[in-house]
Each structure stands twice: as structure tokens, then as C-alpha cells.
Amino acid sequence: MPYRLIKKEGAARRGEFQTVHGTVQTPAFQNVATAAAIKGGLSAHDLKEIRAQVMLCNTYHLHLRPGDKLVAEMGGLHKFTKWDGPILTDSGGFQVFSLAKLRHITEEGVTFNSHLDGHRIFMGPEQSMQIQANLGSTIAMAFDECVENPATYEYAKNSCARTARWLLRCKDEMNLSLIHISEPTRP
């Protein structure tokens, strides 16, 4: 997904990048569809009418409900939402931060207690990429840890280093996932 710079003025810049689901002009507002539905009842048609470019869906929440495997069986998020434009899925990393009282972080990944029913869930870089591949994401984000504020310098430094290591694992897993997706159905 090469980025093309169109114009720059001071620190501001305008550009675009191509995806298999269309061109994205930047900067871009991403319409949030946490559970694959835009709040306020906007449809895919409505999004086109307001010239929306990207739908942002939440990996963690979709993994829990309705389930990434069910979404895959239904043809992926594009068919599930009837949206043919680019879909960005977050990694689940924000939940590492937002569910702080319900999680345990290790080098392997994060163990959560579901906010829905308390059952234990493990998500690491590989699982995050597998879930995003199941969802049929156009733009998949690498699994990361959002550090709390305030945090000690040492904690932030260690978290940043762990996130960089997780990025390499995400890249390896995504490359493996793409091998198993045939070109015509590739997200």
C-alpha cells in the first residue's frame, strides 16, 4: 500500500493510498463501527452519500460477538456490513489498556477476562492477525500495548520494545495468513 504525497504545507500534508477496496485520501476521518455497525443507524449507502472513505471495526469486540469465524463464514466484514470500501480493523491492543483491571500482559500476549461474561480470552500478535484475517479486513493493525498515563519511563520503554517485537510477529503471521487466502477472495 504505497502512500503518495500530493501536497505539503508546513507540517500538514495531503496524500492518498490505494487498497483493494478503493483509494483513501488523507487525512481521512474513519467512521467507527465498533461492532460492524455505524452508531446512529447509518447504512453503507448513507456512508457513500456522505463520502466516507474508511470504516473502522473493533477486532476484540467482533471476536467476542458475533465471532470472527461466523463473520468469515458469512463472507467477511464487507458482506456482513454491505460496505464495499476499505475497512480498517484495530488490533485489540486498546483493550489491553481499557480493560486494565481484567488483563494480564506477558511477552506472549494478553489474557483478558471478557467484559461480557468474564470468561478467559488469550490474544497475542498471531491471534490478532488471525482474527483480522477472518474478519476480512482491508487494513489490519499490528497488536500493541497502549501504555497508561501516567507510566514510569522504564515501563513505557519496556512496553514500546515489546510492541516492536510483537510487530515482527504480526508481520510474520500476516504473511502466513495471506498464503492461505487465494487472490480473488483476498481482502
Name each region found by the language model.
Residues 1-177:
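Non-catalytic, usually N-terminal nucleic-acid engagement modules in DNA/RNA processing proteins
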Residues 177-187:
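Residue-level detector of conserved catalytic or cofactor/ligand-binding positions
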